[in-house]
């Protein structure tokens, strides 16, 4: 196993992003880019990305790995002291199960819960197959990690239960730290330790439907199936009746990562906007903006909106776009039920509304728009330091500097995932095969099977 001597050199951390990191990117890409940007000033960091990027950041080494060639990532992993991984990567790159490099597992996005809503319209046997796959992959991650990160304190309780079920809460980890923060800690979403910059006009006097005196209500991210943009559109006629200068802007109808499936909620939202007669009038749909351009749009907006149904995914979610709103001191309209809604209520950052109630949404929006945006500015001050990336990333930095394996890693048996068809991960691969064949075709399934075969042969 690679040994780290803190007296001789800085530990080398490899951050592996499973999502696009470029001028246009979604929450995961932003998360890993900002982590790497902050940590590069403290330790040796490489950011590995799945596609070519045009970004060039001074002092940050960015490399490209290819899913079709697992060796491109494996050589990076085996030559690092610590690697940060997440999600389905352990399935795509099985060598992660046996690497001696220390593993940090990012549990920020609980995809088991996301899938429950995402596949809701599929046949039940298909939903169960997808769920079994997600559970098996999650359990594998929980067994092999040395340190785990999650998005908030609610998530930490959820994941502590899962870690307990996987044998990771044990006398060894308890003796190491009775609070188990050396095993799992909160590394949520932050914002840069600087003020956002308005470098170009994005909507006011720059878009033909947005006059200079417009009050902009911003849906600042993807229109995902598990969110609730429809209630916002239903409420909109009551808003423009009182504030005819208001414009509702939806950002990001299509994910910047082409591998992410299209969400039906986009079509439903556009159709409802047409139905009420406001599409391309006071309701505007724009494409995903470049990462730096979003700052200008955030500063032009008057309200940031995040509406969702209340369900299990909501309770444990951590929405990137809400942190963007907070960074720009943008008053927030949000549905109750998640952690960020508690912040909005506690600090007076906007208004919290019940789920699915268009009258409440309209009343809250009108109340916010009745006041100048500056009326809310001071309420954001207590959060500026707390949620800056240099503060948020501290638990990960502490782990990297300590350079330790989990105390139970060397004393537990490596997970046996190859000897029996009854293995949970084997069963998940069977479910995954069905899923790939249905969504990507037989050729894609055969290509993935061939890559896995090559990896197994290389280990003989």
Language model regions located:
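N-terminal subdomain of nucleotide-sugar transferases
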Residues: 1-54, 238-241, 436-460
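Conserved donor-binding/catalytic core segment of Leloir-type glycosyltransferases
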Residues: 14-17, 191-195, 202, 206-227, ...
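Acceptor-binding helix/loop patch of EC 2.4 sugar-transfer enzymes
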Residues: 18, 22, 105-136, 157-159, ...
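Donor nucleotide-sugar binding/catalytic pocket of nucleotide-sugar-dependent glycosyltransferases
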Residues: 140-204, 212
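C-terminal amphipathic helix plus adjacent low-complexity
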Residues: 179-180, 384-460
């Amino acid at each position: 196993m690679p040994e780290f001597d803190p007296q001789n050199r800085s530990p080398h951390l490899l951050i592996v992003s499973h999502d696009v990191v470029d001028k246009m990117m979604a929450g995961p890409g932003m998360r890993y880019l900002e982590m790497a940007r902050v940590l590069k000033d403290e330790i040796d960091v490489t950011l590995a990305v799945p596609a070519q990027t045009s970004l060039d950041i001074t002092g940050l080494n960015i490399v490209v790995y290819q899913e079709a060639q697992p060796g491109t990532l494996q050589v990076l992993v085996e030559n690092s002291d610590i690697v940060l991984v997440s999600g389905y990567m352990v399935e795509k790159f099985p060598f992660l199960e046996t690497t001696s490099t220390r593993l940090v597992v990012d549990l920020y996005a609980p995809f088991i819960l996301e899938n429950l809503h995402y596949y809701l319209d599929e046949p039940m046997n298909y939903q169960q197959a997808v769920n079994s796959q997600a559970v098996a992959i999650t359990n594998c991650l929980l067994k092999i990690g040395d340190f785990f990160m999650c998005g908030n304190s609610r998530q930490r309780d959820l994941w502590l239960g899962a870690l307990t079920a996987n044998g990771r809460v044990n006398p060894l980890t308890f003796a190491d730290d009775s609070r188990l923060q050396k095993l799992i800690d909160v590394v949520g979403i932050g914002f840069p330790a600087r003020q956002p910059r308005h470098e170009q006009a994005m909507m006011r006097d720059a878009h033909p439907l947005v006059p200079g005196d417009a009050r902009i209500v911003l849906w600042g991210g993807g229109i995902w199936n598990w969110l609730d943009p429809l209630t916002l559109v239903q409420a909109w006629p009551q808003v423009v009746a009182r504030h005819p200068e208001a414009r509702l802007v939806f950002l990001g109808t299509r994910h910047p990562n082409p591998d992410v499936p299209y969400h039906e909620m986009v079509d439903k939202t556009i159709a409802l906007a047409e139905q009420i007669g406001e599409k391309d009038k006071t309701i505007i749909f724009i494409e995903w903006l470049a990462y730096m351009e979003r700052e200008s749009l955030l500063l032009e907006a008057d309200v940031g909106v995040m509406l969702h149904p209340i369900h299990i995914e909501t309770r444990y979610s951590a929405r990137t776009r809400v942190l963007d709103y907070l960074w720009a001191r943008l008053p927030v309209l949000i549905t109750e039920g998640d952690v960020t809604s508690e912040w909005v209520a506690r600090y007076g950052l906007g208004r919290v509304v019940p789920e699915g109630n268009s009258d409440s949404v309209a009343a809250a929006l009108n109340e916010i728009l009745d006041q100048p945006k500056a009326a809310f500015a001071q309420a954001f001050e207590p959060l500026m330091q707390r949620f800056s990336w240099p503060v948020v990333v501290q638990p990960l930095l502490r782990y990297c500097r300590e350079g330790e394996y989990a105390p139970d890693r060397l004393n537990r048996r490596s997970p046996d995932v190859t000897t029996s068809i009854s293995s949970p991960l084997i069963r998940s691969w069977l479910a995954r095969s069905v899923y790939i064949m249905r969504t990507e075709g037989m050729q894609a399934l055969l290509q993935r099977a061939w890559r896995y075969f090559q990896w197994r042969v290389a280990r003989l």
